[in-house]
Amino acid sequence: MMAQSATFYGNQFVGRKMANGQVYNHGRMVAAHPSLPLGTRVRVTNRRTGKSVVVTVSDRCNCSIDLSRSAFQQIANPRKGRVPVSITRL
């Protein structure tokens, strides 16, 4: 388990190809991570609320983890922008 913080994809990424070759949209349950292998499924848990979501690592980022907007909404209000999370590889 890794303790980090989560952000979410901005609108400018909709329609762009992710590192796995698929096209990003806000409705997919995907995430970008700097080092976990593409295709890895992880549980991302908001450390403040205990809410969690399972996503597939489909892209790369320079941050801890960047969630799709739909995935982020499962664990926090997007107005928060960044939340402390724990990441568990499944």
UniProtKB/Swiss-Prot annotation:
Gene3D superfamilies: RlpA-like domain
InterPro entries referenced in this protein's UniProt entry, alphabetically: RlpA-like_DPBB (IPR009009), RlpA-like_sf (IPR036908)
Listed Pfam families: DPBB_1 (PF03330)
PANTHER family: ENDOLYTIC PEPTIDOGLYCAN TRANSGLYCOSYLASE RLPA, ENDOLYTIC PEPTIDOGLYCAN TRANSGLYCOSYLASE RLPA-RELATED
Family: To E.coli RlpA.
Name this protein carries in UniProt: Uncharacterized protein ssl3177
Species for this entry: Synechocystis sp. (strain ATCC 27184 / PCC 6803 / Kazusa)
